[in-house]
């Protein structure tokens, strides 16, 4: 009896498809970025999510809240022209972008819930938009000259936002408890997949 020279690779649920459509690749990459960021922040208490490095005002909790807002902004306001949903509508903005990253007045449970609920809500919005018009669906927002991005552009912009802040999350999490790694371990369970 012989054994195979290699194991068959079984991708985790957040892995983008090896062979898929453009929409599957974009949504798969977004799913992996969401899962990676969530794993980087997973399992922390209030203090862990509020921890900052001396050179920055960023915290893991602030990144989770900011990206939850980014999801809603891109896929509600920019895509559909609709007002932001709660909890953003009643926060009382201070005319700076800093309020988006504020997590000190929220518990870990509240912060995780805001992020997880935004991911679930916006996954549905993406699925609905793809069913309606695919990646070429024209967004509500324009550049002031009547040029409207397509859903494809909004997804790429959202991926860029995640990529930028997932790098920040690497440094923040390592400073909290030493956790490092590129992707969640295969046995990690995502709260939104």
Predicted regions span which residues?
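Generic alpha-helical secondary structure signal
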Residues: 18, 77-78, 105, 116-119, ...
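Extracellular glycan-associated modules
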Residues: 20, 59, 125
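Acidic/histidine-rich alpha-helical segments that form the ligand environment
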Residues: 96-137, 150-162
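Short, contiguous alpha-helical
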Residues: 2-15, 23-97, 138-193
């Amino acid at each position: 009896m012989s054994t195979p020279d290699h194991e068959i690779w079984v991708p985790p649920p957040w892995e983008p498809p090896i062979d898929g459509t453009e929409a599957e690749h974009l949504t798969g990459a977004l799913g992996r970025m969401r899962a990676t960021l969530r794993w980087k922040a997973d399992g922390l208490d209030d203090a862990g999510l509020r921890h900052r490095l001396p050179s920055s005002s960023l915290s893991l909790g602030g990144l989770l809240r900011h990206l939850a807002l980014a999801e809603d902004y891109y896929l509600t306001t920019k895509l559909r022209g609709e007002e932001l949903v709660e909890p953003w509508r009643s926060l009382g903005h201070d005319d700076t972008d800093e309020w988006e990253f504020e997590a000190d007045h929220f518990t870990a449970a509240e912060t995780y819930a805001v992020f997880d609920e935004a991911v679930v809500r916006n996954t549905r919005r993406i699925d609905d938009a793809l069913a309606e018009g695919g990646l070429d669906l024209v967004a509500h927002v324009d550049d002031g000259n009547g040029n409207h991005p397509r859903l494809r552009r909004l997804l790429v912009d959202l991926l860029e936002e995640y990529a930028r802040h997932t790098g920040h999350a690497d440094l923040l999490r390592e400073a909290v408890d030493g956790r490092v790694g590129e992707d969640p371990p295969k046995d990690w369970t995502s709260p939104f997949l």
